[in-house]
């Protein structure tokens, strides 16, 4: 029997297990140095494979729909940061100051690629446009996220020079991605054939970052500084932000006259945030001991968005099926 879509997937369970492992068996000293090196190699490999998997033809096919892309990018890089700032009076009492900074970091991140496309496809939306929007959003994030982080968190003294951050992210994330794109001509078919196996490389890289980040944070006293009540407040905060993002993207898509297929793409690409990009970026942008609290809101938001968007995608798909069935029956009446 298949697992209901609203239950956590295996990767989410692995994330939880990794956090627990870091809590009870954190790496430190020379072991932490070794893990740091392995993690850096894993991140480079992760983005190399992302570049090798991404079809240039699919991006070009979706590029002509510039109004849709502009709206998605505006939702990702303008609407979300404004929500994070506007909700500060409501969110700050619910979470610790460190977790609120993590929420602001979440709001500055690009859209996720794989799940945005998967949910758009499931809901019968404009898949080529989703591929283009989500992929370009991820690339824009290399440059825009450090600038947004500096603007949103700079006053708190949590970030360094934004240009230095862009340089580090370009070297660690964008260069491997471009290398993967360049070599796609020769290795693309092999990557496509081995997608199920290579998925473990993706997930393993993220788990490595989470383990090293939470190990450092635990050693610095993370769980003594984050009470359970703040974690409950963080859950509520993530639900509120996602709900507002879904409502606003839906309303904007309808008010601006987009088709139902385009609305689906805007909703799923404009309301999601990338764990695969966010965790490595946090490692570059923040001190190792600060990464844990920074990515905790993102990890929680990631699971909530998967559960909610799975249900929403199924509702969209059912409506499309019902409409098609009604249209097919119409001539016989």
From Swiss-Prot:
Q: Which InterPro entries match?
A: Na+/solute_symporter_sf, Put_Na-Bile_cotransptr
The lineage's top-level taxon is Bacteria
What GO cellular component term, any one, is given?
A: plasma membrane
Disulfide partners: none
Concerning its family, UniProt says:
To E.coli YfeH.
Please state what the protein is called.
Answer: Uncharacterized protein PA2026
Q: Which organism is it from?
A: Pseudomonas aeruginosa (strain ATCC 15692 / DSM 22644 / CIP 104116 / JCM 14847 / LMG 12228 / 1C / PRS 101 / PAO1)
